[in-house]
């Protein structure tokens, strides 16, 4: 995948210009269309790579799960080009993580073909021996009645239920309203729990234009 122009954030910063990435996924089906084991590798040009091996299981059309062991180089962001890329892009140049390895587990749910919820737990050890536990949650809503939603929660320093609203836990939400075929209005919301008693909130609005291009 290649993004020539990048994405302009609500603060006016252009993120991801000339960024490319590629990946490979080898899966071995254990139960057709339900359970497989896999090996994945992804590379972000100039920003490292990630290797993952694990298993995926689909309980039904509604629920699914994934468990894997991962090895990630510094500055690599898994799922960088995901469904939230246009609304909430990650500035790779601001990432200064150490290389790390550890376990990843997620549970997902699809509701009425419009909603997707996913909860994730990660436990990593860095190259220097530091351990970290991260809890992530995301909710996406496809465009319905001209409205779409992307919301996320992240706690990079998870240490039990008491840490869910402390230690840099972050809530983000982007609500989009389609004005016409070529533009939409977006409200960005962010809330950061610096400590259990200190909270930072911010709002921003923008108009996004989409120009159809045919080749």
PLM feature spans:
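Signature for the C-terminal beta-barrel architecture of outer-membrane proteins
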Residues: 1-169, 200-202
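Predominantly the C-terminal beta-signal and adjacent terminal strand-loop region
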Residues: 73-90, 172-215
